[in-house]
Amino acid sequence: MMKRRNSFNNSYVSVNNRTGFRRSKVCPLAASKDEDIDYKNIDLLSKFTSDYGRILPRRLTGVCAKKQRKLRLAIIRARFLALIPYCTKKV
């Protein structure tokens, strides 16, 4: 590990010489083809919502963009039909 000078604020920044191996993320919904995204599948939809009922972002779940849009639409439909709550915890 070596230190390199940062020209932005004249401070030293630690730089790691090793290049890390980044594993490519695989969409968890694309792997299971038998499980379809549906607004009636409450168990699946609850995996992609937070404790407070908010939809989790792609960077946390690892879902591809196409499936994330389908998930969002299914969660909105399930909320509208009162299958899942809008907010689960008291704030």
From Swiss-Prot:
Pfam families: Ribosomal_S18 (PF01084). The keyword Cell cycle does not apply. GO terms for cellular component: cytosolic small ribosomal subunit. Keywords: Ribonucleoprotein, Ribosomal protein, RNA-binding, rRNA-binding. GO terms for biological process: translation. GO terms for molecular function: small ribosomal subunit rRNA binding; structural constituent of ribosome. It comes from the Bacteria. InterPro entries: Ribosomal_bS18 (IPR001648), Ribosomal_bS18_CS (IPR018275), Ribosomal_bS18_sf (IPR036870). Part of the 30S ribosomal subunit. Forms a tight heterodimer with protein bS6. PANTHER family: 30S RIBOSOMAL PROTEIN S18, SMALL RIBOSOMAL SUBUNIT PROTEIN BS18M. Belongs to the bacterial ribosomal protein bS18 family. Binds as a heterodimer with protein bS6 to the central domain of the 16S rRNA, where it helps stabilize the platform of the 30S subunit. This is Small ribosomal subunit protein bS18. It comes from Wolbachia sp. subsp. Drosophila simulans (strain wRi).
